């Protein structure tokens, strides 16, 4: 089971868009405002909607919760500047599809189809969205405050706190999990501990000492979050990981280790969706992939007042590659300076 395709019409920045995915790692690149995060949020909402019988939150509601438009109005997510129009979000898997249709002016025209088959196919699916900004250092009572409407965060922040707060996993760590945990612990120099809804880092070899997450560098907190999600069984075979800007606040020297982890998770059956601006992350994925890895790059770009896309399995083959373009421009500037 995996996500295969998304089709959008008159939704946020998109007029018409249809993107096919691979079962492995899908990497979205593009300038700001091209909708990278919008796409992975929609896919996450579709995954979460499969649990609607348990959570009471359907596809339409989850979309509103992850985008948080004014007045929680779905209609505000229609593409602006096109007048009265029909909008739709369609997400396809191997065996089913989930469709949300609505009109930009009429609330009563909202319709969701395909929910029953979708929920049946993905009944056991675990999906996780890691936002660009680290939030675990502010986790104490935050979920309750969000639910009470006292603070304004979209659901991706609340959900990642809930996912990380699961403090146990079934049975002892297997060989695969132990390998991942040791690799990440080499970077963080510690493991995660949860006490009274607070996250701490226990430095390696100092069992009686603990560091509040607020005292740990943000980049290391993000890596510690990965450690916790693997430790508690959230990232397992058959799960889906969405990660917005993995490179944010990460020391560049740790990017290769993150890439190796993502490649191994994919080989172990985790489907991954990433939105990034980082040349090193995108290029390391391309350079270190093996025949066992499946990677598809999706470049989003602006053309004639609309968002277009192209997809390639080879990073260098993308014609509208904003990341590579900036790297080349920088190289030209350096050469010019040397030649002066």
Language-model regions, residue ranges each:
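Phosphate-binding P-loop
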Residues: 17-23, 233-236, 264
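Pre-Walker A-like glycine/lysine-rich segment at the N-terminus of P-loop NTPase domains
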Residues: 1-44
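DNA major-groove recognition helices of helix-turn-helix
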Residues: 42-47, 282
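Residue-level preference for the first positions of well-ordered beta-strands
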Residues: 25-27, 127, 240, 271-273
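C-terminal lobe/lid and adjacent interdomain/linker elements of RecA-like ASCE P-loop ATPase modules
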Residues: 257-340
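Walker B catalytic acidic pair
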Residues: 244-246
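Phosphate-coordinating catalytic segments in nucleotide- and nucleic-acid-processing enzymes
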Residues: 5-7, 46-241, 303-340
């Amino acid at each position: 089971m995996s996500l295969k395709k998304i089709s959008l019409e008159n939704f946020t920045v998109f007029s018409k868009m249809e993107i096919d995915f691979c079962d492995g790692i899908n990497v979205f690149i593009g300038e700001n405002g091209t909708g990278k995060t919008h796409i992975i949020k929609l896919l996450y909402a579709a995954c979460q909607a499969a649990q609607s019988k348990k959570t009471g939150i359907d596809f339409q509601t989850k979309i509103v919760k992850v985008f948080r438009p004014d007045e929680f109005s779905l209609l505000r997510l229609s593409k602006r500047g096109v007048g009265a129009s029909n909008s739709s979000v369609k997400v396809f898997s191997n065996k089913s599809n989930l469709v949300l249709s609505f009109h930009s002016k009429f609330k009563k025209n909202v319709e969701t189809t395909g929910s029953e088959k979708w929920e049946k196919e993905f009944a056991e699916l675990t999906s996780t969205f890691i936002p660009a900004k680290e939030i675990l250092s502010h986790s104490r009572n935050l979920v309750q405050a969000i639910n009470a409407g006292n603070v304004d965060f979209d659901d991706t922040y609340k959900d990642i706190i809930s996912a990380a707060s699961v403090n146990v996993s079934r049975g002892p760590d297997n060989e695969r999990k132990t390998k991942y945990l040791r690799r990440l612990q080499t970077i963080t120099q510690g493991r995660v501990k949860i006490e009274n809804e607070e996250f701490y880092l226990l430095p390696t070899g100092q069992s009686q000492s603990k560091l509040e997450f607020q005292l740990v560098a943000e980049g290391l907190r993000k890596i510690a979050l990965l450690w916790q999600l693997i430790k508690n069984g959230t990232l397992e075979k058959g799960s889906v990981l969405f990660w917005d800007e993995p490179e944010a606040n990460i020391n560049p020297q740790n990017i290769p280790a993150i890439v190796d982890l993502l490649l191994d998770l994919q080989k172990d059956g985790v489907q991954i969706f990433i939105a990034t601006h980082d040349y090193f992350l995108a290029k390391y994925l391309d350079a270190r992939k093996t025949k066992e890895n499946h990677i598809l790059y999706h470049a989003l770009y602006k053309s004639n007042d609309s968002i277009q896309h192209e997809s390639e399995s080879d990073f260098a083959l993308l014609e509208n590659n904003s990341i590579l373009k900036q790297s080349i421009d920088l190289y030209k500037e350096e050469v010019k300076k040397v030649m002066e």
